[in-house]
Swiss-Prot record:
It comes from Methanocaldococcus jannaschii (strain ATCC 43067 / DSM 2661 / JAL-1 / JCM 10045 / NBRC 100440) (Methanococcus jannaschii). The keyword Ribonucleoprotein applies. InterPro entries: P1/P2_N_sf, Ribosomal_P1/P2, Ribosomal_P1_arc. HAMAP family: Ribosomal_L12_arch (MF_01478). Keywords: Ribonucleoprotein, Ribosomal protein. This is Large ribosomal subunit protein P1. Residues 74-90 have a biased composition (Basic and acidic residues). Residues 69-91 are annotated as: Disordered.
């Protein structure tokens, strides 16, 4: 997370997000820098509008409760299917017994 925080700090300060800048922020914070992670972060942020990403990241949190409703409907369908299967099994069992005592 420190790497992302460093990038956000640079962005909020209006500085360019480069490998050297991220390394400087992390070093100033006393974090041991992993060059591979820094390179991956800079490459991943290339062409990304950070302001837009922050705004979009906040929106799904508010929409998350609405997503729970379809899941509940799916669970209800599964329960109904299980009940129907149980009824079919019971009917088959009764038919089998009737055949025995016919």
């Amino acid at each position: 997370m420190e790497y992302i925080y460093a990038a956000l700090l640079l962005h909020s300060a209006g500085k360019e997000i480069t490998e050297d800048a991220i390394k400087a922020v992390l070093s100033a914070a006393g974090v041991e820098v992993d060059d591979a992670r820094v390179k991956a972060l800079v490459a991943g942020l290339e062409g990304v509008d950070i302001e837009e990403a922050i705004a979009n990241a906040a929106m799904p949190v508010a929409a998350a409760p609405a997503a729970a409703a379809p899941a509940a409907a799916a669970e209800e369908k599964k329960e109904e299917e299980k009940k129907e299967e149980k009824k079919e099994e019971d009917t088959a069992a009764v038919a089998g017994l009737a055949a025995l005592f016919g």
